[in-house]
C-alpha cells in the first residue's frame, strides 16, 4: 500500500526517530500517524530492505493479531523512495492525540488523583507485559511514547523498532534523554526486559511528582542522582564487565522514597523500590508488578 494514499494534515513532531505527521485516510476518514524513517539499503541484487527490518516488521504485524488494547496499532508499512544508500520506510500507526507528558501537564493542581494513577499504571504494565511475553524489549520508555486516548486508555508506542530506528538516529543529531535509562544501560552492560521496568519506576514517580525523578546530564551524573536515592549498591551487584568502577561513586545509603514522592503511600513506595532495584535480576517484572497489592486496593486515605 502506498504512503501517498494518506493525506498529510499536520506535522506532529520531529525526534530522534524522524518526522511524524498526522494524516487522514480518505477511504475511511480516520486519522493516522505517519513516521518516515530511513533504513540502509539491504545491498542485495536490486537493493531492498535489510533482513533485520523485514523481521522486525513481521514480528510487529504478528502482534497485531492479538489487538492488545494497550499497544499502539501498526496499521501499514510502506517502502517508498530509495537511493543506493538507503530506503525510506513509512510506518502507519493509529493516531492518538496526546502523550503522557501532555496528559500530566493538563491535569489541574495538585495533579492526578491516586486512583487515576493506579488505573494508568495497570494499563501501562499490561501493555508492557504483553510486549515482554513476546520477547520485545522497548528500551526507550518515557512519557513521550506512552500515549493516552481521550477516554483514558494507555497505549505504548515506538516499541520493537530498535534496529529500524538505529540508522535514522545515527543520522539525526537529537540528544536522547538519559532520565529514564536503567543503570545497566548507563553502564553499557548487557540488558534485557528489566530495563523497561526501571523506566516504568521513573514514570510511576513522575505521575505523582509531575516532574522527572532523575535529571542527569551525563551517564555518570545520572547514576549519581540514582544512588542519591537508592544508595550505592553493594559490590556483588555491580556488573563485572563495565568500564566505570563502583569506586568512582561516593558511598551513600538509601533515602526514603517519600523524600522525593511525599504523596505516595507505603505500599506504593514499596512497589516503586522494587522497580528501582539496581540489580536487574532482582527487579520486579511487569507480570509480578501487575499482581502487586498497591494496584488492587482502594486508597485508604484518599481525600
Swiss-Prot record:
Residue ranges that the Swiss-Prot or TrEMBL entry lists as coiled coil: none
Binding, ATP: 12-20, 35
Protein name in UniProt: Cyclin-dependent kinase 4
Subcellular localization: Cytoplasm; Nucleus; Nucleus membrane
PANTHER family: CELL DIVISION PROTEIN KINASE (PTHR24056), CYCLIN-DEPENDENT KINASE 4 (PTHR24056:SF129)
EC top class, as a word: transferase
Origin organism lineage: Eukaryota, Metazoa, Chordata, Craniata, Vertebrata
Family the entry assigns: Belongs to the protein kinase superfamily. CMGC Ser/Thr protein kinase family. CDC2/CDKX subfamily.
Chief site of localization: cytoplasm
